């Protein structure tokens, strides 16, 4: 295998300092070398356990430390989760992600989590989970159950991280990514723009991700959704061009990764989203909610896809599953419900 050179902070900083249109042009060229620019991967994520999280992530309404009005819910029954997965597949999603507001999963819950993964896989969907910190044995059990992706975000740079989270170290996050990778599960890891970080911190986040032994297969880039009751509720809004620039740099640095528009899409107009796709974003969460924050309605996504000439990507998981793209084009026009908590996984 050819040696992959490591990025330096000065190189990443130079990318962030490029004139925006030059940066977009470079990012789109890189994107076209590795992906069909008209294809966008579509995921649905269900909150299988909501709220009452012991962590203190300052952006998160699911933390038990903040009064956000979020009603906590226990771990869903396996069949409830699988019924939601069936509906997601019928609506055209090709990947079903399951998120739980935990610091880490308890051993008593592992059999139920394994059954969820097995059931989702049996439908011909890709399976993804975000459950917090994992032990080696837990990662291996999920891998044996058939889990395709595990999400565990780094959130920001190592230098700024302590300003946002104190209940879990940066190294713990890196260790979980290593355990997931060693178990044979694909890695999904990204971060959040708008935490109060500097451009240098955004560069530092992408540097950490790109310089992992193997970069994440999926890189969600979130725009902070400010929730009343959280410590970051009064943060300044993120400039759209700054967000687009972050997408473009991520694409250039991780040319074969899927770069996902995640939380914050509800705050973006069509023009901003279009420029994000131009910058190399090629994955979205689809549906009405991102765990506990709004996401554009499904029919709006389809309308935007049509305006831009984009198509939902087909994913061959099991034979006979390629009709999902047609189902998406039909089902996206039906009214949305509040059943899904689709999210930039935390």
Curated annotation (Swiss-Prot):
Pathway per the UniProt entry: Cofactor biosynthesis; biotin biosynthesis; biotin from 7,8-diaminononanoate: step 2/2
Cross-referenced CDD domains: Radical_SAM (cd01335)
Subunit annotation: Homodimer.
Job description of the protein: Catalyzes the conversion of dethiobiotin (DTB) to biotin by the insertion of a sulfur atom into dethiobiotin via a radical-based mechanism.
Originating species: Escherichia coli (strain SE11)
Lineage: Bacteria, Pseudomonadati, Pseudomonadota, Gammaproteobacteria, Enterobacterales
Gene3D superfamilies assigned to the protein according to its UniProt record, in alphabetical order: Aldolase class I
Protein name per its UniProtKB record: Biotin synthase
Free-text comment on the cofactor: Binds 1 [4Fe-4S] cluster. The cluster is coordinated with 3 cysteines and an exchangeable S-adenosyl-L-methionine.
């Amino acid at each position: 295998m050819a040696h992959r050179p490591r990025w330096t902070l000065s190189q990443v900083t130079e990318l962030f300092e490029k004139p925006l249109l030059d940066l977009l042009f470079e990012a789109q060229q890189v994107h076209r070398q590795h992906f069909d620019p008209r294809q966008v991967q579509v995921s649905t994520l269900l909150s299988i356990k909501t709220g009452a999280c012991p962590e203190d992530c300052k952006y998160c309404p699911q933390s038990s430390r903040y009064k956000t009005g979020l009603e906590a819910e226990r771990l869903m029954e396996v069949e409830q989760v699988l019924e939601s997965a069936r509906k997601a597949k019928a609506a055209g999603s090709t990947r079903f992600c399951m998120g739980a507001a935990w610091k880490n999963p308890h051993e008593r819950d592992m059999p139920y989590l394994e059954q969820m993964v097995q059931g989702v896989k049996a439908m011909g969907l890709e399976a993804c989970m975000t459950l917090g910190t994992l032990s080696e044995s837990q990662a291996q059990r999920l891998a044996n159950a058939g889990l395709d992706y595990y999400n565990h975000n780094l959130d920001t740079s190592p230098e700024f991280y302590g300003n946002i989270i104190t209940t879990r170290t940066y190294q713990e996050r890196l260790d979980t990514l290593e355990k997931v990778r060693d178990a044979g599960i694909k890695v999904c890891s990204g971060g959040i723009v708008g935490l109060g970080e500097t451009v240098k911190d955004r560069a530092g986040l992408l540097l950490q991700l790109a310089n992992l032994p193997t970069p994440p297969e999926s890189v969600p880039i979130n725009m902070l959704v400010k929730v009343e009751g959280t410590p970051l509720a009064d943060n300044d809004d993120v400039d759209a061009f700054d967000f687009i620039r972050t997408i473009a740099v991520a694409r250039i640095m991780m040319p074969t990764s899927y770069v996902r528009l995640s939380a914050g899409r509800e705050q973006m107009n069509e023009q901003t989203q279009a420029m994000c796709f131009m910058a190399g974003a090629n994955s979205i969460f689809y549906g009405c909610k991102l765990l506990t924050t709004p996401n554009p309605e499904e029919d709006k996504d389809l309308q935007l896809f049509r305006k831009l000439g984009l198509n939902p990507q087909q994913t061959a998981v099991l034979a006979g599953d390629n009709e999902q793209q047609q189902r998406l084009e039909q089902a996206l026009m039906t009214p949305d419900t509040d059943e899904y908590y689709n999210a930039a996984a935390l």
